[in-house]
């Protein structure tokens, strides 16, 4: 039984993989103020609720984009499972060739997604991860990680509009039926959501052209993250949504790096 931990800016996703399938997954809030003891209590409660025995965990792997939380999480792993976790970072075996100017700058989440996408599809790809930030990554058919781009996530865009425009309210991210709206709330929803979809479509179009100019076949576009399905339902530039892409990548990296 393998424990997979994906630490994002907003949430931590934990998954349990056993006998070639996922048997449990949880989402908890990312909180850098929590101690290792607090995380230990929370994780043990999740295991108890799922009727899982911590002693059955053979290994743990962690991917994190929040450096100041790692001390607490690594200590939690040692306390709860009496094991050293594998941490995604410089020196880890990935099976892909990172073509970034400084490979150490590539976020762990982007590496994990790229590994999963390449291992599963073996074709030129654009990977979009709709998280707190939205990331776009380009992978060649040979497994070269060419790079990509990062932009504010949909929720960040909504929060910024509320915080910087005095008369605009905080809104729920719901998709209105029209882009010609007749009240403030739906006008904001339309501008944020449909404007965001337009941004995704342009970036994908531009990335496809640049990759094909390098001699790649037309890339397959794979999306993951919390709002992937919302965007997918409104555009034809995304070929597939894979909600478990990051957990799949962590499992692959664990197998490549376990002793």
From Swiss-Prot:
InterPro entries to which the protein is assigned, alphabetical: ATPase_NBD (IPR043129), Type_III_PanK (IPR004619)
Catalytic activity: (R)-pantothenate + ATP = (R)-4'-phosphopantothenate + ADP + H(+)
One GO MF term: metal ion binding
Domain of life assignment: Bacteria
GO terms for cellular component: cytoplasm
Cofactor(s) this protein cannot do without: NH4(+); K(+)
Keywords, ordered alphabetically: ATP-binding, Coenzyme A biosynthesis, Cytoplasm, Kinase, Metal-binding, Nucleotide-binding, Potassium, Transferase
Protein name in UniProt: Type III pantothenate kinase
Subcellular location per the Swiss-Prot or TrEMBL entry: Cytoplasm
Entry binding sites for K(+): 129
Catalytic residues as annotated in Swiss-Prot or TrEMBL: 109 (proton acceptor)
GO biological process: coenzyme A biosynthetic process
Cofactor binding description: A monovalent cation. Ammonium or potassium.
Family designation: Belongs to the type III pantothenate kinase family.
Top enzyme category: transferase
Stored Gene3D superfamilies: 3.30.420.40
Pathway: Cofactor biosynthesis; coenzyme A biosynthesis; CoA from (R)-pantothenate: step 1/5
Function statement: Catalyzes the phosphorylation of pantothenate (Pan), the first step in CoA biosynthesis.
């Amino acid at each position: 039984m393998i424990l997979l931990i994906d630490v994002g800016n907003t949430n931590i996703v934990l998954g349990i993989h056993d006998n070639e399938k996922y048997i449990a997954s949880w989402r908890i809030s990312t909180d850098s103020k929590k101690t290792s003891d607090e995380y230990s209590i929370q994780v043990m409660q999740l295991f108890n609720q799922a009727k899982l025995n911590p002693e059955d965990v053979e290994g743990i792997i962690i991917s994190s984009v929040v450096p100041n939380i790692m001390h607490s999480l690594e200590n939690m792993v040692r306390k709860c499972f009496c094991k050293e976790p594998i941490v995604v970072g410089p020196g880890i075996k990935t099976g892909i060739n990172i073509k970034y100017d400084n490979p150490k700058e590539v976020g762990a989440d982007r590496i994990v997604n790229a590994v999963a996408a390449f291992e599963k599809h073996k074709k030129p790809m654009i990977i979009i991860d709709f998280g707190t930030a939205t990331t776009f990554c380009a992978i060649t058919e040979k497994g070269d990680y060419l790079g990509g781009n990062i932009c504010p996530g949909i929720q960040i865009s909504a929060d910024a509009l509320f915080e910087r425009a005095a008369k605009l309210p905080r809104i729920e991210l719901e998709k209105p039926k029209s882009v010609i709206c007749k009240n403030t709330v739906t006008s904001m929803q339309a501008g944020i959501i449909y404007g965001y979809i337009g941004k995704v479509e342009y970036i994908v179009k531009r990335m496809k052209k640049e990759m094909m100019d390098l001699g790649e076949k037309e890339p397959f576009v794979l999306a993951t993250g919390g709002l992937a399905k919302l965007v997918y339902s409104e555009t034809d530039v995304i070929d597939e949504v894979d909600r478990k892409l990051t957990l799949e990548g962590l499992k692959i990296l664990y197998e490549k790096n376990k002793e």
